[in-house]
Structures are given as C-alpha cells and as structure tokens.
Amino acid sequence: MTDFDKIFEGAIPEGKEPVALFREVYHGAITATSYAEILLNQAIRTYGPDHPVGYPDTAYYLPVIRCFSGEEVKKLGDLPPILNRKRAQVSPVLNFENARLAGEATWYAAEIIEALRYLKYKPDEPLLPPPWTGFIGDPVVRRFGIKMVDWTIPGEAIILGRAKDSKALAKIVKELMGMGFMLFICDEAVEQLLEENVKLGIDYIAYPLGNFTQIVHAANYALRAGMMFGGVTPGAREEQRDYQRRRIRAFVLYLGEHDMVKTAAAFGAIFTGFPVITDQPLPEDKQIPDWFFSVEDYDKIVQIAMETRGIKLTKIKLDLPINFGPAFEGESIRKGDMYVEMGGNRTPAFELVRTVSESEITDGKIEVIGPDIDQIPEGSKLPLGILVDIYGRKMQADFEGVLERRIHDFINYGEGLWHTGQRNINWLRVSKDAVAKGFRFKNYGEILVAKMKEEFPAIVDRVQVTIFTDEAKVKEYMEVAREKYKERDDRMRGLTDETVDTFYSCVLCQSFAPNHVCIVTPERVGLCGAVSWLDAKASYEINHAGPNQPIPKEGEIDPIKGIWKSVNDYLYTASNRNLEQVCLYTLMENPMTSCGCFEAIMAILPECNGIMITTRDHAGMTPSGMTFSTLAGMIGGGTQTPGFMGIGRTYIVSKKFISADGGIARIVWMPKSLKDFLHDEFVRRSVEEGLGEDFIDKIADETIGTTVDEILPYLEEKGHPALTMDPIM
C-alpha cells in the first residue's frame, strides 16, 4: 500500500466488505481490457505496429498512460505491453485495494479504445458532431487554467449514465453551472440535457464527451492539469494521485442502471481520489461509505457530493430571473437570438466606476433612467450608460479601473447576457430568452452591487448603480466618463517600473504549480494576462495574506537585466527554495517561471537572431518546430527555461519587453491573430522605438511560413533589424 492509499484506510468496517461490488468491478475490468485487446489487435493488423497513434492538440501523448506510468505512446506497437501489464494487475482476489487497481486498468483500457477511435481523425472532419467534444485539447485545459487556479471553478463534476428524469437532471446541471463547476457529461445524460435546452459545450465549461469509454476524456483532462500546472513528472503515479486529491476537487455522479464496465471505470475515479455517488438504491454489500454510495434524492445529491469532497462555497446567491455563474462567461448571443443591443458603435454607450464620498451614495440603490427592456420592441438598439458609484474607507482612485474592468466578467456571468469592450467602446446584448425569463435593466445593477461587494470586500463598503438608457443622459454622463478616463490615463502614463518603489508578487497559481512565482510590475502584467500591477495592489489591500504581496524594490544589482536583491530574496522563499534569482528584463538568463496559464509563449530562434511568439489560441506549427501545446509542456510547471517563457499578450507592447535583449525588434515571427490583436498599440511602440510604422509587416507569420527555412528569406528581403543586431546567444 502506498502513502496515498492511506486515505482509504477504515473506509470499510470489518466484516462489511462489499464483495458483490468488488466482483462487479473485477468483471468490468476484465471486459474492458479484453475489449481493448481485441480492438488493438485489429488495429495493428489493419495499420501495422508502426502506425502513429495519439490525440490531436496535446503534448501529453495518451495522457492517462503518460501520467500514471510515463510512457510516450507514439505508435500502435507501443500499446500491447502496456495493456498486458495493466491487465495482469486485475486480480480475482476481491478486496478494496484490488478493486481500485482494476479501476486504474479500466482507465487504461478506455484510453486505448479511445485512441484507436482517433486513428480515423481528420482536423476538417470531427469524429463527433457539435456539441459533443470527445477528447479536449491542451489549449482548452489551459484556457480555463486561471479559473481553476483562483477557484472561480470550485471543482469538477463528472456525470455519467441516464437520469431518472431529464428535468431533474437539468436542474442539477444548472445548479452546478451556477456555482461555477466544470462539468464532464457522458452517455444518455447528454441527450437528456439537450432535450431540456441546457447549453452545453466548451464555451459553457460543460463538456458533453460522448458515450461509454469517452468518459475517459474527463480523466485525461484532469490528469493533464497535474503535469501542465503542477509540474508533476510523467509517471510519478502517487504524486499525481495526491495532486488530484488535493487540487482537482472532483466527484462522480453515476446515474441510472449500473453496468459492470462503468462501475469499473468509476473505481478508476476512486483510485484517483474522487468519490462516486449514485442515484440507485444500493444494498449493503454494494456500498463503501464516502467512496461509493447512494443518494436517491436529486435535491440533495449535489450538496452531499460537495460535502463528501470537501467543497465549501461562500458566494452570494443572487435572486435573478436568469441563471448566473462563470459557466456562461463564454456564451455568444447571435443577432437572431438578440432582444436588445447597446453600444458597439451602434449607439452611444459607456461604463464607469467612480469613487464618491459617504454623503453622495445610498448603499444598494439601483436606478434605471430611460426606457426599460419591457418598454421596447424586440430587436431594438438602445444607448446605455452604466455608472457604478463606490464608497469605501480604503478605496483609492487607482482602484477604479480595476473594479471597472470586472464589469465585463460580472455581466457575462449572466445566462443570456453578453458584454465585450470597456469604457466607452463597450458593446452589450441581451437575449430573447433572458427577456422572456424576466430580465430587466435593474438586474444589471443587482449583479454589480452584489459582485463588487463579494469580490472587493476590503475596499468596497457601499455600491450604488445607475443605468441610463435615455440618450440625452447617456451623452451627458459620457462627458463625465471621458474626463475620468483622461485623468486615469494621465496618472497611468507616469506609472513605470522606475517611478514606483514596490513591485508585487502573484502566487495565485501556486495552488496548481507550487514553485511558480510571478513578479508583477507597472510595465509587466502577469503571464496569465489577468493581473496588472494595480490589480495586485488592490488585491493586497483586499487581503494582506493573499496571493499578491508587496516586494520593496531594494538592493539594485543590475538595472539593465532587471535584478534586485529584494526580489531574489522573496523569490527564494516563495518558490520553496527552488529558485535563487530572476531577471525581469531578459529572456536569456534566469527568466520568470511559467506555470501553465500563460496567454502566449516566446521562444528563441537562434538562426534568425530573434524570438518567435505563439499563443494559446494558435494551434498550428511554429518555427521553433513545436506547437503551443508542445512548448507549453516543456516550460510549464514553475520552472525557469532560459530562451523560453510564458507571457501575457499585453507585455509585448511594454517598454520593458525583454528590454535587455533588444525589445520588440527581436520579434521575427508571431501568428497573424496576435498581430491583429496588438496592431494599433504595436505600431505605436514600433514608432517609439524608431522601427517605423511598417515594422509589424517585417515580422513573419503563418502565411509566410512555419519553419526557419521558410521565414528567413522573408526576413532578409524585408530587412528585419534582428538580423543585424548583436547575437542573441
């Protein structure tokens, strides 16, 4: 027995062994591994042992196998010895330990069966029609990494089988979505939810995986998080199980009639530390308290599952006519589904958070000035102003922009609400469905009052929201907003690394990557792109013991490379004594660590004397010879990798962007989508650096090539400055 397995000690009272359950698991594991063997032999006969095998968009081969035993499975011939070894661990001796090992073997069998399915995969011909996902690629795991790290996603719920009642299942799923859970759904439960018009798919963090063995894609998603963010070494089986138990707070809802293979797969979850709760009545010889047990009441099943897994939520429950939670943040509202639209250059619109005095505010007051949604016809376009007044004893003018940017998140949490942009270039839509359920403009105010207080309790004492839809009032307050924006921008222009005496740490991701430390400065956003210096400063005011700690800028060692003694001292302690020095302004010597939530990766291209940058959203090959996923697997987990580094996208247009290495003049390749995202600011910075307005056109992208040999002639033809700079190495 391993140290991890001690968590199972005492789970079964002496003399109460559920032998019938263990027998079911044994037969299920034998069936699963035998089926995998038959399919594998057929595949080898058809394709040959040297035929490639793997999933798309991952650097982790077959993740269950890579994680638990470390093998880099690349071809069909690699699989028979692995399957034979796992089949041999399925023992006819019926006890809890052997049942868990049989569960692990079932996960291996399911992974092999699914990998064989992907032998027929073509990028332009998905194996499953939307919204079914099948295997979920690394970019999606990383996309939601920061929400897992900061517990916006409080846990993972894996739902398999068929519910007694589709409406009751829809209620369970909506409850879980409202609380922010990541959902993995398999078998007939998917069809039941689609019948009830529950929104499923990657954008809703609710993955309809498919049927039967496709449940393994929940397992290979969770296991990649350990390797991706936690730096768990492939094959470190016990360390990975410990990580899953501590960091990935998952549970399984096993619904409907039991099947021996599904039950064996459920024991794979138990092997990894995830409890299994079923809605079926279970006799005493088929239960294990806290690990495999029955809750027949659908109104209690989620609460008991959360209690069993140790998940406690303290979020404010809003009384809204629509569902509300992070699951809906990625929802799009198409024109045909829209009831009303505001801003987006179609009508005047703005949003503003401003600090007011105690006498200027009535806490909780929400006022709508102008027509409400029920007073306008479907398809209308309205002007909109959102004015959020804040009073707080510790509130500072510098925090206004931090709170204002969260309006985007908070509104998007509403099902049927859509928000993009900020300040006076915001754009909002409300769906027909949300209006039919009773959504009105005052609900915007209720959301903002509650969330501002919940998220910023240390600096926000009172909140008042005014919603303007009267055009004259919108235009009047738009001028007030513009004056505020100008004041902020003037203040921010003076905020540089040189003008402050304090940097901030961000160790939020240490819940996933224990040795990773971000150093956030006025001119360097956190690598997730979500934490600026002002965000970190506000976070510290909210929670002095939180993830963002002030680091006095003391003991300057090298101002060119960006080395300070105080920063190094903090780094050494915060990285669990793993790192001794960080250079903030160079890629080439002791760069910042990378966890796994980064928006982009930069990598040295010595042949071009420069660097390339790729993003989480770009799945294609790069001139480094690696995709984003492969690069991310190489540098993630809290390690320093000179020549490679994860970054937030806006850092690229900072004056401190690898300034010791030559700055933006070193960039020789980046995806076209990144060029488009940064375009105006990048051109402005290029002019500031004396590189000219057309410098962005001298940088190659995927339309020019994806290898050094393809892009080098282009760089030479365009006279790219990196080619004549001092050697980068």
Curated annotation (Swiss-Prot):
- Its biological purpose: The beta subunit generates CO from CO(2), while the alpha subunit (this protein) combines the CO with CoA and a methyl group to form acetyl-CoA. The methyl group, which is incorporated into acetyl-CoA, is transferred to the alpha subunit by a corrinoid iron-sulfur protein.
Return one Gene Ontology term, BP aspect: acetyl-CoA metabolic process
Name the residues that bind Ni(2+) 2.
595-597
One GO MF term? CO-methylating acetyl-CoA synthase activity
- PANTHER family per UniProt: ACETYL-COA DECARBONYLASE_SYNTHASE COMPLEX SUBUNIT BETA 1, PTHR42281
Keyword annotations for this protein, in alphabetical order, are: 4Fe-4S, Carbon dioxide fixation, Iron, Iron-sulfur, Metal-binding, Nickel, Transferase
According to the UniProt record, what class of enzyme is this? transferase
Query: What's this protein's name?
Result: Carbon monoxide dehydrogenase/acetyl-CoA synthase subunit alpha
- The protein's organism comes out as Moorella thermoacetica
Identify the residues that bind [4Fe-4S] cluster.
506, 509, 518, 528
Matching CDD domains, A to Z?
Answer: ACS_2
Q: Which InterPro entries does the entry mention? A: ACS_CODH_B_C, CO_DH/Ac-CoA_synth_bsu, CO_DH/Ac-CoA_synth_bsu_3_sf, CODH_A_N, Prismane-like_a/b-sand, Prismane-like_sf
